[in-house]
A protein has these predicted regions:
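ATP-binding N-lobe of GHMP and related small-molecule kinases
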Residues: 1-106, 120-136
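A generic structural signal for well-ordered coil/turn residues at beta-strand boundaries
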Residues: 7, 29, 40, 158, ...
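ATP-dependent small-molecule kinase catalytic core of the GHMP/sugar-kinase superfamily
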Residues: 134-288, 292
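Structural beta-strand/beta-sheet cores of well-ordered domains, especially the beta-sheet scaffolds
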Residues: 3, 9, 31-33, 42, ...
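Residue-level signal for inorganic ion chemistry
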Residues: 44, 247, 299
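Acyl-group transfer acyltransferase/transacylase scaffold of fatty acid/polyketide systems
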Residues: 294-301
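Long, hydrophobic, well-ordered secondary-structure blocks that form the structural core
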Residues: 96, 104-156, 160-163
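Active-site-proximal beta-alpha loop/turn segments in soluble metabolic enzymes
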Residues: 103-105, 265, 301
Length: 301
């Protein structure tokens, strides 16, 4: 058989940076909330056929139609992590064919959309085996599985505004999967546009995994994790009343805080480029002069 899913990338407004390795795989040290990026997506098909040898994993990986060996270890690791929750996967050989509508490893989270699309394909196989599965279970488990491939992928499964991580004031929020933000959202955010500027087209010098690990002994980590909770609390009424000035303050502060954490870790590193600062200053100048409520956020790369 064959299934195909597309999943969008997402951009966090309140950033996920730091993991609780003591609690298991891909458990966030703080909650995050993200906008879904509808036009930046990964389209993935998974063809599957029964195989004889069920002791090991068997899959071929095509990226934009061409074999891509260097992506295989990440998929292998993902399969190993989800195996306890999907034991039937070892019965099949998979041909995974994936493509993005945006550049890979350029600071737009292709691992988020990629793992979300893959998780939904695997859930479609499980649903074919268990047709009585509910839609709610399908998407919640897909988000749970996607998280095991890439933390932020759990925010790319379902919803326009998605929360991941335990947050007291947000019903149903969990460290294990993302949930659509269920509170009232002002119409100003319904058609909020996200323009992506690629400042530097090279791959980032420090992987997110390494960056997350550097939060373990970070001198400012504990305060940062508290701040993320506080910022999500503040965003709840902002989303309801459409206060763009307050929204901008939190979103820009979060972006700069994320990069401040990188600059103050040990070893320290800078993923911003000189042009990034030029763009930030140009946005501030334009906003000041025109009073247009435009703001920036930054990804981890």
């Amino acid at each position: 058989g064959i299934f195909q899913w597309s999943a969008p990338s997402n951009i966090a407004l309140v950033k996920y940076w730091g993991k609780r390795d003591d609690l298991g795989h891909q458990i966030p040290a703080n909650p995050s909330i993200s906008f879904t990026l509808n036009n930046c997506k990964t389209i993935t098909s998974v063809a599957f056929e029964k195989k004889v040898n069920q002791d090991n994993w068997s899959f071929d990986l095509l990226f934009e139609g061409q074999p891509k060996e260097e992506f295989k270890p990440k998929i292998q690791k993902f399969l190993e992590r989800i195996a306890p929750f999907m034991p039937f996967l070892k019965d099949y050989h998979f041909t995974i064919n994936t493509q993005n509508t945006f550049p890979h490893s350029s600071g737009i989270a292709s691992s988020a959309s990629g793992m979300a699309a893959l998780a939904m394909n695997f859930m479609s196989i499980e649903k074919a085996l268990n047709p009585e599965m509910t839609e709610e279970y399908f998407y919640q488990k897909a988000s749970f599985l996607a998280r095991l491939g890439s933390g932020s992928a759990c925010r790319s499964v379902k919803g326009n505004l998605v929360v991941w991580g335990n947050q007291e004031n947000i019903e149903g929020s969990s460290n294990l999967f993302g949930v659509p933000f269920s509170r009232k959202v002002h119409s100003v955010f319904e058609n909020y546009q996200d323009t992506i500027l690629l400042v530097d087209k090279g791959e980032k010098q420090v992987s997110s995994t390494v960056g997350h690990d550097l939060m373990h002994d970070h001198p400012f980590a504990a305060r940062r994790f508290e701040q993320a909770h506080e910022n999500i609390d503040q965003l709840i009424p902002i989303f309801e009343n459409g206060d763009l000035e307050a929204f901008i303050k939190i979103v820009e502060s979060e972006a700069l805080t994320l990069h401040a954490m990188m600059m103050t870790s040990m070893p320290y590193f800078i993923l911003m480029k000189p042009n990034t600062l030029q763009i930030i200053n140009a946005i501030w100048k334009y906003r000041n002069e025109t009073k247009t409520p435009v703001c920036f956020t930054l990804d981890a790369g």
